[in-house]
Amino acid sequence: MIEVKKFEASWCGPCKALNPIFENVSKKFGNDVNFSYIDIDEQFEQAQKYHVRSVPTVIVEKDGQEVQRFVGVQSELAYTNSINENL
């Protein structure tokens, strides 16, 4: 199973800029991939667990193991390619 976790914060401008890209990628994969949003202020322990140091950070996991990490806003193609490589 592929999981894509977006670590964000309500005060983060780049996080807001990433939202439409993340939503488009989510729509492309539907139920084949699990997408989640994690607010680092509300779920600080998750941010610590994944060693998130800046936002936005997107982590792609396959079978519970991290396979790719993106820090900052990337292109829709970058996220899509990473997911496709791990399906």
Residue ranges and their predicted role:
Residues 7-21:
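Conserved redox-active cysteine motifs that mediate thiol-disulfide chemistry
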Residues 7, 22, 26, 30-44:
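Thiol-based oxidoreductase modules, predominantly thioredoxin-like and allied folds used
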Residues 43-46, 77:
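Short loop/turn elements that flank and shape the SAM/SAH-binding pocket of Class I
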Residues 60-87:
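Non-catalytic, surface beta->alpha helical segment in thiol-disulfide oxidoreductase systems
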Residues 50-59:
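Structural micro-motif
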Residues 1-3:
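Extreme N-terminal starter segment of soluble prokaryotic enzymes
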Residues 46-50, 82:
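CheY-like receiver
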